[in-house]
Amino acid sequence: MATQAIIEGFEETLWIDADMVFDVEAVERIRFHHQPIVAGLYSKRGGRAFTSAFMPPTEEVSLGEQGGMMELSYAATGFLRVKREAYITIQKNQRLPVCNEMFGNVPVIPFFEPMTIEHEESHWCLGEDYSFSERARRAGLKIFADTTLRLWHVGDYCYGWEDVGNRIQRVNSLTVRCSSNPSRPSSGTGADVPD
């Protein structure tokens, strides 16, 4: 799709995974930035970590109202805006070939093709999102995250920032106040919806 966007003259792409939840304002906000590559941060499902990787030696990240722009080592593509200039720079610098022209379909430039890199006396097989980031950094581009964006990652429930910073408290028993007032919306279980 990135190759097709370049061929058709689009100025940017916005990659959004089907399991992301966000306010529409997040789209305009990520498009507003001048940096060629900007990601939104979101939690891994079931883990206390973000899907993107921060530049070492990042020790602290402010999110939401206290957030801003910060550089990443690797960006997950669940909410990622890439400007045309970034694709062109990566293709030229990394000498990426135009593939599959012989089939008569839209050709493919392998921006996201998985790659293996050396890592701490071993090897690391990168998925397509981290491979794109690796190629971008090798091409001299910086990858940024807008840490003000509030994104939710759908899984067993909607994972948010809180899942990265805190353990969800699980309990053996729970008492929930139920409402008998039919005029107030409920969650469908009879339990009150939080204000």
Q: Language-model segments: which ranges?
A:
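Polar low-complexity intrinsically disordered regions
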Residues: 19, 28-31, 169-176
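C-terminal catalytic/acceptor-binding lobe
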Residues: 94-195
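Conserved beta-strand edge residues that scaffold enzyme active sites
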Residues: 19, 44, 150-151
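Active-site charged/polar residues at nucleotide-handling catalytic sites that mediate phosphoryl
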Residues: 8-9, 33
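Short beta-strand-to-loop acidic/aromatic patch adjacent to the donor-nucleotide binding site
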Residues: 9-21
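Short, Asp-centered acidic motifs that coordinate Mg2+ and/or phosphate
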Residues: 12, 36-37, 143
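Conserved catalytic core of nucleotide-sugar-dependent glycosyltransferases
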Residues: 2, 23-115
